[in-house]
Amino acid sequence: MNNIKKYILTLDEGTTSARALITDKEGNIIAVEQSEFTQYFPKEGWVEHDAIEIWNTQRSALVQVLNKSGIDPSQIEAIGITNQRETAVVWNKETGLPIYNAIVWQDQRTADYCQTFDKDTLEMVKQKSGLIINPYFSGTKVKWILDNVPNARQLAKEGKLMFGTINTWLIYRLTGGEVFVTDHTNAQRTLLYNIHTNDWDDELLKLFDIPRNILPEIKSCSEVYGYTFKGLFSKGNEQRIKIASSIGDQQSALFGQLCLEKGQVKVTYGTGCFILTNTGEEIVKSNHGLLTTVAYSFKDKVYYALEGSVMIAGAAVQWLRDNLRIVYNAIETEWYAGQVKDDRRVYVVPSFTGLGSPYWDSFSRGAIFGLDRGTRREHIVRATLEAIAYQANDVVDAMGKDMKKPIEIFKVDGGAANNKFLMQFQSNISQSKVIKPTNIETTAMGAAFMAGLAVGYWENVEELKKTYKVHFELTPELSKPEVDKLIKGWKVAVQRTFKWVEEIE
């Protein structure tokens, strides 16, 4: 029986879909299953998910990936979880059911509330949490649920509510309600966590009026939290599997890219675009609009990172496809962009839900600048792809300033990293080498690596490094003066979108 091959199963719960992946010891993806779930937009700027639908979708993907691969649950050494961060779920402890839809990280309903704090409070929050007061983070979302759902405050007072980000919700469900935990990376994105003590902070809880009794216990990213409930995989199947990692999706990609040394950078192009640089055990405070975040943790050690968050990246391509209908699918954008020699000085600023790092303007809105009678569909498509690279470059530039050293190399992943036009433009505009690994599932691999390390599937980080293979490397093809001219136009365009909503009301 000892010769039976073992695997790691990863649950990758994203913003638009729930995925399940099976990985072997060599870092190969054996099977993948993906199911999309519904996006709800009840009002302008509001974004919600049905947490029950997320659970059902994730469970279905988990069962289907095992069926598809022919791998028995007994061959799974451990389950790792990675998730969309900040999205907040509050549920009733007695029924196990959410009292309101999950409020998604993109949601802007608390933007006005976030404007009400004085300078000293803003500085206190940044000093303690590493973050800024912004609708993006979970804390203000939880406050909104407690303040607006009938009887929620009373239920919280009676100890009948539980709050978690999606990882906590999934672990709670996977264990049949036995385990209520989170990890350092997800806890830190709530605005309620102190990066110096690595625990919930009473002053922050008081500021946002959130009772401590609704919060989960904080654990490391790599340890056994509990076991799946009997019957999870099929009726009558009593197999219970260790749940051995929990890590926010962007931190998971950093670990999956094996950016384990100080100064190493990864850029993930998903719905948004997220750039992290490892700062080791040092907490680096940003003076250039970035966030200080937990990178990952083990039982005895916490590592930190600087992060820049771009709200709209791949979502801008979805907008071209679904709203403007000028492309049939995302893959076509590379072809369209290559049909014109330049962007004809057209700039697209896709700040549909405001601007993230380094600007942090919740009231900016999207715009297209530089249109004339000669502008064609190809120019707009090209400018939209370029906008993704410009936004990432704004963050990479800020990172170089905070780290007091220019970023010369970064590793890329996410769906849009397959777009060669975008990757070459990114290399050009950032004047950096861009490296893409063969296995683009770096987010899932980070959680898999963490789970595998927790149960001894992999002995150490050196073993993990053997699994990393490079697909391509790109170097800049434009000179610095050419790039400076392009960036100047981008800066002008971005600045003209600032405070748009405020100024027209």
Curated annotation (Swiss-Prot):
Pathway: Polyol metabolism; glycerol degradation via glycerol kinase pathway; sn-glycerol 3-phosphate from glycerol: step 1/1. Sn-glycerol 3-phosphate binds at T15, R85, E86, Y136, D249. It comes from the Bacteria. Inhibited by fructose 1,6-bisphosphate (FBP). The keyword Zinc does not apply. Its EC number is 2.7.1.30. Disulfide bonds: none annotated. ATP binds at T15, T16, S17, T271, G314, Q318, G415. Gene3D superfamilies: 3.30.420.40. ADP binds at T15, R19, T271, G314, G415, N419. It catalyses: glycerol + ATP = sn-glycerol 3-phosphate + ADP + H(+). It is an enzyme of class 2 (transferase). Keywords: ATP-binding, Glycerol metabolism, Kinase, Nucleotide-binding, Transferase. This is Glycerol kinase. It comes from Mycoplasma capricolum subsp. capricolum (strain California kid / ATCC 27343 / NCTC 10154).
